């Protein structure tokens, strides 16, 4: 048997898009066949039917109306599918043989640009990742706005994960021969649509130079050029058109921004909460009070990429301060901003020929506000505002064109007429007049025929099948004069008639209407094309509006929450007076948050060692220091009475327990990997947050590791990062007298009767107990358990031999010099004879030989910890024997 011609055509088109669901246009429907139909019927909950295709079995089929396709496309794209749109390329009534059809667009998660369904507060990025010769390049594009930027770096898996985490792309393009471990890590950590491409796909095709007038290959590495070319090629192939709004190539350097690895972003809840991935409860939720979608997207970018350039930060802070101090001007600015639509995405639609008349009307109404904004800018003095004033284009010519041409309430579709105002085009006015006169003639005909026949219910109607007709109900048919009308249609309750004069007028009316709709569409396209020439001007003004909106948002937040302007320093100090957690204070009753001071530097206050019970507020305090630092480097006021913040290059956090079972890693192993990453990558300009390091293993192992980490951070002159270290190992408080830079702090607790009250105040000095049983009581453990726990604790405390004293653990002086050469100390830890970590009890020659043979010059921090852990376990095993 042979396939039908239509089905042959379908399979030929399908061959071009094997990885897509093909929407095949047949009349007023998009039809899907075979496997595509089965998939779509399941995902879209459509009825699966069949169609004769020339084979013995009917082809599985389902379909959707073409006019409602957007909703179905969105549902499929959100589930990670790609959709190929195949349209009819000629009028079926004029076609000779089978209608010509072909793919006009491929919609993928990363190239989806329908603003009706996109999150207006977040960019929809597609990302390409290209690795070659121990270098990696990453390129990002948001088709809806035209943003296109890239970076390159020496190959580092953590850098790749950090950038994916930062920009959260919907789709990732990568070369098929990418390292399997990197690919596995990406799949484990992110929900992202991945498209594998042959390495040749990324070859240098000179596409970037063709797309971006300011791009020069000589300025960039080959790996970056290939990465960018691959992304641009994919975009052009899927969109099937030139995209003029993608006209600016930006190369960014990762080290130009405050770096936060994937764990830090998660732990600090920068854009979403850990618990339920909600925006509410994140730092972004606090800072985003933007009036426009453009501002909301930009402030998200600011939050994801805090600055490390003092001049740029101070410019933002000075602008925010001026708005805070000029409340009247600030309110005027907010009033103007709230009426501005998403100019960036409207411009994207203009470029891709998808804009409708309502969106052009929104563009006009937005442009109308630009003179007001320019007037406000002229009254402001901050350098950032002066820069904006000189660059803001009021776009008056575009406003005048749209004001004179587009109807005030046009339809959504652009092929149904009623788009163009009277007076803009003479021919349109004449056709409207003809159409109007024709309909007036119809109305007069209805009136005269009622009078002539005496049938008061007689009416002149219209439908697309029969055109105009005279309708008479069954009860009045006897009153119709003989020979006056020609019967056209009989219905159950009426008869429909025509006359030669009515048909003649119908031709005139419909002819005028058809010409009018066609001409209005032509004029609309002409207006759109005229505006498209000024895309650059519109993008510049839109970007200025977005920046203004961000500054306005930060000013609003500062005023609403009683924030202060931080002082940005070049040194290493962090000094915060009455600091507060920006998120927590908004989630509890106003005024109930307990503020705390912070003093940190790289000398006497480098390592703040914080002890105290669970639930007392240690983690909140440490996070607030990190968040205040981030806010300051964004250019935001901060939740504190005063704050002086030295520029920070990186923020690291190691907070909470997290298994990575899919990778076969335990909680403790994950913890050690994270600590290792911190020690390898932190610098003297970094801020480190460490919460309960070492708790994932036995007490003495954990204590040993925590102690070694503190020594390493404080004694390594190439590190010496400012660090907040929370611990339950109270023995560590004695390190304040042993290691320069360690400073003890604790969370104050008040004992009342037999209960405790957390005062949430950070005070100098270490805590001497954890109040663990009291916390357990607060958590609701049974009374019997609490009583028994106290009995056991009393018994343990009475046995003094079971209490470890850190003074008994001799600090090894020799390793400090070695650590300044990036080594890990694995020298013997000497302790009380009653404990398992006592190396003096180890007499077996083979273990001694193993220890003496360790080449510490070639151990990194992680290997050092692992080796120490292994030696301790062997020592325990020998002791048991």
From Swiss-Prot:
SMART domains (UniProt xref): MUTSac, MUTSd
InterPro entries noted in UniProt: DNA_mismatch_repair_MutS (IPR005748), DNA_mismatch_repair_MutS-lik_N (IPR007695), DNA_mismatch_repair_MutS/MSH (IPR017261), DNA_mismatch_repair_MutS_C (IPR000432), DNA_mismatch_repair_MutS_clamp (IPR007861), DNA_mismatch_repair_MutS_core (IPR007696), DNA_mismatch_repair_MutS_N (IPR016151), DNA_mismatch_repair_MutS_sf (IPR036187)
Pfam families linked to this entry: MutS_I (PF01624), MutS_II (PF05188), MutS_III (PF05192), MutS_IV (PF05190), MutS_V (PF00488)
Family matches, as CDD domains: ABC_MutS1 (cd03284)
GO cellular component: cytosol
One of the record's GO molecular function terms: ATP-dependent DNA damage sensor activity
Single Gene Ontology BP annotation: mismatch repair
Binding locations of ATP: 612-619
Keywords: ATP-binding, DNA damage, DNA repair, DNA-binding, Nucleotide-binding
NCBIfam families membership: mutS1, PRK05399.1
Stated role: This protein is involved in the repair of mismatches in DNA. It is possible that it carries out the mismatch recognition step. This protein has a weak ATPase activity.
PANTHER family linked: DNA MISMATCH REPAIR PROTEIN MSH1, MITOCHONDRIAL (PTHR11361:SF34), DNA MISMATCH REPAIR PROTEIN MUTS FAMILY MEMBER (PTHR11361)
Homology family: Belongs to the DNA mismatch repair MutS family.
Name this polypeptide is given: DNA mismatch repair protein MutS
Species whose genome carries this gene: Clostridium tetani (strain Massachusetts / E88)
Lineage: Bacteria, Bacillati, Bacillota, Clostridia, Eubacteriales
């Amino acid at each position: 048997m042979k396939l039908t011609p239509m089905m042959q055509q379908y399979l030929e088109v399908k061959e071009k898009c094997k990885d897509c669901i093909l929407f095949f246009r047949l009349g007023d429907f998009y039809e899907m066949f075979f496997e595509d139909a089965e998939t779509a019927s399941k995902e879209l909950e459509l009825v699966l039917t069949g169609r004769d295709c020339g084979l013995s079995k009917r082809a599985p089929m389902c379909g959707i109306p073409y006019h409602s396709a957007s909703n179905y496309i969105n549902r499929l794209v959100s589930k990670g599918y790609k959709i190929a749109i195949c349209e009819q390329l000629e009028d079926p009534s004029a076609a000779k043989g089978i209608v010509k059809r072909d793919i006009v667009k491929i919609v993928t998660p990363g190239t989806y640009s329908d603003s009706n369904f996109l999150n207006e507060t977040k960019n929809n990025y597609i990302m390409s990742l290209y690795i070659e010769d121990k270098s990696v390049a990453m390129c990002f594009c948001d088709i809806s706005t035209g943003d296109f930027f890239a970076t390159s770096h020496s190959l580092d898996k953590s850098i790749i994960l950090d950038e994916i985490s930062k920009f959260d792309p919907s789709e990732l393009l990568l070369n098929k021969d990418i390292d399997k471990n990197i690919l596995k890590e990406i799949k484990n950590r992110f929900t992202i649509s991945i498209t594998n491409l042959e390495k040749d796909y990324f070859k240098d095709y000179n596409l970037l130079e063709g797309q971006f007038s300011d791009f020069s290959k000589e300025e960039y590495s080959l790996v970056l050029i290939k990465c960018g070319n691959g992304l641009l090629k994919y975009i052009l192939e899927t969109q099937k058109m030139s995209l003029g709004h993608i006209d600016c190539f930006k190369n960014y350097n990762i080290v130009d921004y405050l770096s936060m690895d994937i764990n830090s972003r998660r732990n600090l809840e920068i854009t979403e909460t850990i618990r339920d991935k909600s925006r509410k409860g994140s730092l972004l939720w606090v800072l985003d009070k933007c009036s426009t979608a453009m501002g909301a997207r930009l402030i998200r970018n600011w939050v994801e990429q805090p600055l490390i350039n003092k001049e740029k930060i101070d410019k933002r802070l000075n602008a925010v301060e001026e708005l805070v101090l000029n409340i009247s001007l600030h309110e005027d600015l907010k009033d103007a901003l709230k009426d501005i639509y998403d100019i960036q995405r409207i411009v994207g639609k203009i470029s891709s020929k998808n804009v409708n008349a309502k969106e052009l009307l929104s563009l006009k109404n937005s442009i109308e506000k630009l003179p007001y904004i320019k007037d406000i800018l002229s009254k402001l003095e901050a350098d950032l505002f002066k820069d904006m004033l000189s660059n803001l284009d009021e776009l008056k010519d575009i406003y005048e064109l749209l004001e004179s041409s587009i109807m005030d309430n046009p339809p959504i579709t652009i092929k149904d007429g009623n788009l163009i105002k009277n007076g803009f085009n003479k021919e349109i006015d004449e056709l409207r007049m003809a159409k109007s006169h024709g309909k007036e003639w119809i109305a007069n005909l209805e009136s005269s025929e009622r009078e002539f026949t005496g049938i008061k219910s007689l009416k002149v109607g219209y439908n697309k099948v029969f055109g105009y007709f005279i309708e008479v109900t069954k009860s009045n048919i006897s009153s119709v004069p003989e020979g006056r009308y020609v019967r056209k249609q009989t219905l159950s309750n009426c008869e429909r008639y025509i006359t030669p004069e009515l048909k003649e007028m119908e031709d005139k009316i419909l002819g005028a209407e058809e010409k009018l709709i066609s001409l209005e569409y032509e004029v609309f396209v002409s207006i759109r094309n005229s505006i498209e020439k000024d895309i650059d001007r519109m993008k510049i003004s839109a970007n200025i509006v977005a920046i203004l909106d961000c500054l306005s948002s930060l000013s609003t937040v500062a005023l609403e929450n009683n924030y202060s302007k931080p002082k940005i320093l070049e040194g290493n100090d962090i000094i915060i007076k009455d600091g507060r957690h920006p998120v927590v204070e908004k989630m509890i009753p106003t005024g109930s948050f307990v503020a705390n001071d912070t003093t940190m530097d790289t000398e006497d206050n480098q390592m703040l060692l914080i002890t105290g019970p669970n639930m007392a507020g240690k983690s909140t305090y440490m996070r607030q220091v990190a968040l205040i630092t981030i806010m300051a480097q964004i250019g935001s006021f901060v939740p504190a009475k005063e704050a002086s913040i030295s520029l920070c290059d990186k923020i690291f956090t190691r907070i909470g327990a997290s298994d990575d079972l899919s990778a076969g890693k335990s909680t403790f192993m994950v913890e050690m990997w994270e600590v290792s990453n911190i020690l390898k990558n932190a610098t003297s300009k970094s801020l480190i947050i460490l919460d309960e390091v070492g708790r994932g293993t036995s007490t003495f192992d954990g204590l040993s590791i925590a102690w070694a980490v503190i020594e390493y951070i404080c004694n390594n002159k190439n590190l010496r990062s400012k660090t907040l270290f929370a611990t339950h190992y109270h023995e560590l408080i004695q390190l304040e007298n042993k290691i320069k830079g360690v400073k003890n702090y604790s969370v104050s607790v008040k004992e009342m009767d037999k209960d405790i009250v957390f005062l949430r105040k950070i005070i100098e000095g270490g805590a001497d107990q954890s109040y663990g049983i009291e916390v357990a009581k607060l958590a609701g453990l049974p009374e019997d358990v609490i009583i028994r726990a106290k009995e056991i604790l009393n018994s343990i405390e009475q046995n003094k031999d079971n209490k470890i004293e850190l003074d008994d653990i001799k600090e090894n002086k020799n390793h400090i010099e070695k650590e300044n050469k990036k080594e890990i100390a694995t020298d013997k830890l000497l302790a009380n004879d009653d404990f398992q970590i006592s190396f003096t009890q180890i007499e077996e020659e083979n273990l001694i030989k193993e220890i003496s043979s360790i080449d510490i010059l070639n151990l990194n921090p992680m290997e050092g910890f692992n080796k120490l852990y292994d030696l301790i376990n062997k020592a325990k095993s020998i002791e048991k024997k």
